[in-house]
Amino acid sequence: MERIIGGKYKLGRKIGGGSFGEIFLATHIDTFEIVAVKIENSKTKHPQLLYEAKLYRTLEGGSGIPRIRWFGVDGTENALVMDLLGPSLEDLFVYCGRKFSPKTVLMLADQMLTRIEYVHSKGYLHRDIKPDNFLMGLGRKANQVYLIDFGLAKRYRDANTNRHIPYRENKNLTGTARYASCNTHLGIEQGRRDDLESLGYVLLYFLRGSLPWQGLKAVDKKQKYDKICEKKISTPIEVLCKSHPVEFASYFHYCHTLTFDQRPDYGFLKRLFRDLFSREGYEFDYIYDWTIIKYQQSQKTRSQSQAVPGSSNARAIPMDTSNHRGGTKISHEAQVSDRVRPANASGPSPQINTAVGRSLGFDQVHKNMNMPSSTSLSPAGTSKRNVRPETSNSGFGSGNKTGGWTSPFMSPGK
């Protein structure tokens, strides 16, 4: 028997789940648009969909913020219907051989900084900045970076007085240890500076391929956190950023000069990276590393299929759903997350010169290359809490361990 959510979304197959609830694909019964639906039992001990829905409503309209289509009670369950998005940056990082080029990192950094600035402008901290929580769009928005998973978000200004929350110490670690700021490790209340420091670690992770505090052995989570904290604090910025442009070290130095309640100069940080981008002679054409890989594969497949009709060995982005579990947010303050899960461009579509000398528009490249359309939409709070940090993967893609991911639908691109 077909199940209709909110009177207009026909529930499809399950694409993720865990202790927090389950994620399904769904299709609008009139427009046939495909969306993502997060469902949780309304009697769960720690319900969070209502909180997430309210927060998304607050952020609604911002570039790179998923839209809520419907929220309400369906029988005995709460349901949140949202945009379906593409693969996470962690998925794409793995797909590209666990390293991004400086050009790709800088193009991503510009959008990621803008997303964080927007969330801060609405009075909230994200508090779980990591590659898994940035997803690419689909279709015509395949170039746009989205920020998701606000399950640990917190107001840093009082809604009535607009005063900044007070400085506190002895706080539990909230977020993901690998990317947490030094002050977060030390138990200091998080502020805007901490989201930005976490972003810095994400960017270095992309450039380096790993961070010095990954893979540390420990007997329990506390010891693991302590070791990560010790290694992170004892690693000089210049060592962390060695062999990479000085702008990345400057980024960290700036973050460390910010006081607890100081408003960051987001424009300064974006100019820092934009000036580097220009100096290196890059073109902001939204052609990322994964775009090139998929294009090269499509060319190879095309030549092979011409030699052997019907043959194809193109691989899609591998998506491991065996680890796509979720976790219940115990509370904003008590939650300790120790896991790490592996654009709308304006102006004319950039061109890629093909081997035969003709040009292929960016949108056409995505179409011809079967650019992976992951079902990684994570309505807020779907990231995996309390999963071992070196093993979990990102998002809610559809796939298996042995085969590449294949899109079961056409990218909505609405």
UniProtKB/Swiss-Prot annotation:
InterPro entries: CK1_Ser-Thr_kinase, Kinase-like_dom_sf, Prot_kinase_dom, Protein_kinase_ATP_BS, Ser/Thr_kinase_AS. Gene3D superfamilies: Transferase(Phosphotransferase) domain 1. Residues 330-341 have a biased composition (Basic and acidic residues). One of its GO terms (biological process) is protein autophosphorylation. Its main location: cytoplasm. SMART domains: S_TKc. It comes from the Eukaryota. ATP binds at residues 15-23, 38. Expressed in seedlings, stems, leaves and flowers. The active site is at 128 (proton acceptor). Disruption phenotype: Hypersensitivity to blue light (BL) leading to shortened hypocotyls in BL. Keywords: ATP-binding, Cytoplasm, Kinase, Nucleotide-binding, Nucleus, Phosphoprotein, Serine/threonine-protein kinase, Transferase. It is found in: Cytoplasm; Nucleus. PROSITE patterns: PROTEIN_KINASE_ATP, PROTEIN_KINASE_DOM, PROTEIN_KINASE_ST. It is an enzyme of class 2 (transferase). Induction: Induced by blue light. Belongs to the protein kinase superfamily. CK1 Ser/Thr protein kinase family. Casein kinase I subfamily. Protein kinase involved in blue light responses (e.g. hypocotyl elongation and flowering) by phosphorylating CRY2 to reduce its stability. This is Casein kinase 1-like protein 4. It comes from Arabidopsis thaliana.
